[in-house]
């Protein structure tokens, strides 16, 4: 898949029709009760559980012949759970997950092209470039509920305490460093250190995706248009030089997962950090007052870059289990990815941008105070080519970040080792 800049913009409302038949399917769905299995780690997360339980209740009330059976496992285990179940002949019908999960599930032979299951009118309502970001061999294999670049969240109260204007967040990495010098001198009410800037580097795939977004900030790349490793560029080197500098100055918590950064931010011990837009729900679930001190800003500009970021999305990855379950799954997906279902979700739980043209003018998005500062970044999103071993690549990026921070390794030497190891991993 070719690299693309992705422009996710708020457009005028477009009304589209709906079809109850999946594209290209002449097989007749059986009548009678149907159960579809949906793998969903969010059922185990307190901030999201009530929403998904209500989705099941409302959908089953509207579709009495269809039953939703949840398959749950923690975030880091749900994909393995799905694959292991399939190996035993028990396949789910959909996986609620992240865009980076798509290539692995396609490679495992589980994911189906979305147009094989969903109605043409429904699929055609999605922004074309968003759908292209889910493509494998020219076909989209995931359907997004909503999308977002990585955004910069910052604590307005800490900015004030440091003598900084809370309405003027940094725009460049150099500005961020000057802000960080002041913010790093603060202590919280209990005398705990305040970290100035958070960039996740822990050994989980999403941390690697976040590091890729940082490379994009600096105008660099990790993979070329053909999906080959391509890190001999200044932007890549500059990004990891920044990771190293943030560590040396003590600004960034070492080996932190996104959930660790969210916890520190919620407790007032982290002034700025990069996150997916929906990460704010994790912050708010820890500290409800976060609504009053949190603001968002565009990704920082570094080196020769323009502050581009990486597209992130929560999506459904679909599995074809025959006509009856396929037809039921079509109804379920269209029920969930609708303004009626997602309006309160995007307003109260997960600030993000709709992926459908007909949902662009939703009040819960247009007037979302948390999203306001980061909104222009939606037009500067760069797509990472899909490769089957994207998770392995992301883990190697984390290992590189840890090598130049915790390991105190020389940057150039660490990059050379990364190139050698990552090349082998992604070619397997």
Question: Could you describe each region identified by the protein language model?
Answer:
Residues 297-298, 346-403:
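Long, aromatic- and glycine/proline-rich binding clefts that accommodate carbohydrate-like moieties
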């Amino acid at each position: 898949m070719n690299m693309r800049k992705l422009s996710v913009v708020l457009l005028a409302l477009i009304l589209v029709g709906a079809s109850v038949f999946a594209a290209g399917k002449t097989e007749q769905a059986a009548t009678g009760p149907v159960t579809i299995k949906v793998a969903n780690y969010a059922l185990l997360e307190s901030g999201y559980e009530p929403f998904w339980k209500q989705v099941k209740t409302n959908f089953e009330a509207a579709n009495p012949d269809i039953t939703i059976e949840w398959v749950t496992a923690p975030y880091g285990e749900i994909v393995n759970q799905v694959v292991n179940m399939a190996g035993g002949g028990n396949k789910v019908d959909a996986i609620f997950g992240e865009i980076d999960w798509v290539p692995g599930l396609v490679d495992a032979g589980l994911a189906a092209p979305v147009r094989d299951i969903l109605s043409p009118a429904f699929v055609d309502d999605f922004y074309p470039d968003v759908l292209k970001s889910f493509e494998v061999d020219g076909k989209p294999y995931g359907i997004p509920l909503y999308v977002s670049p990585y955004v910069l969240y910052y604590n307005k109260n800490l900015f004030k305490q440091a003598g900084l204007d809370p309405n003027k967040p940094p725009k460049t990495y150099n500005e961020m460093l000057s802000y960080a010098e002041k913010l790093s001198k603060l202590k919280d009410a209990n005398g705990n250190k305040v970290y100035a800037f958070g960039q996740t580097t822990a050994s989980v795939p999403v941390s690697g995706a976040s590091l890729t977004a940082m490379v994009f900030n600096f105008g660099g790349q990790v993979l070329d248009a053909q999906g080959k490793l391509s890190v001999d560029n200044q932007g890549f080197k500059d990004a990891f030089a920044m990771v190293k500098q943030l560590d040396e100055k003590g600004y960034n918590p070492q080996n932190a997962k996104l959930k660790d950064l969210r916890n520190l931010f919620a407790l007032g011990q982290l002034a700025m950090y990069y996150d997916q837009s929906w990460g704010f729900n994790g912050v708010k679930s820890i500290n409800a007052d976060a609504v009053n001190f949190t603001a968002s800003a565009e990704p920082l500009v570094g080196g020769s870059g323009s502050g581009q970021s990486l597209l992130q999305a929560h999506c459904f990855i679909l599995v074809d289990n025959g006509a009856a379950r396929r037809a039921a799954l079509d109804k379920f997906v269209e029920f969930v990815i609708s303004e009626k279902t997602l309006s309160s979700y995007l307003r109260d739980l997960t600030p993000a941008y709709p992926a459908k043209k007909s949902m662009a003018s939703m009040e819960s998005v247009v007037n979302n105070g948390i999203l306001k500062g980061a909104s222009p970044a939606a037009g500067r999103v760069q797509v990472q080519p899909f490769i089957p071993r994207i998770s392995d690549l992301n883990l190697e990026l984390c290992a590189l970040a840890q090598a130049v921070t915790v390991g105190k390794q020389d940057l150039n030497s660490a990059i050379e080792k990364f190139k050698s190891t990552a090349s082998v991993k992604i070619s397997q």
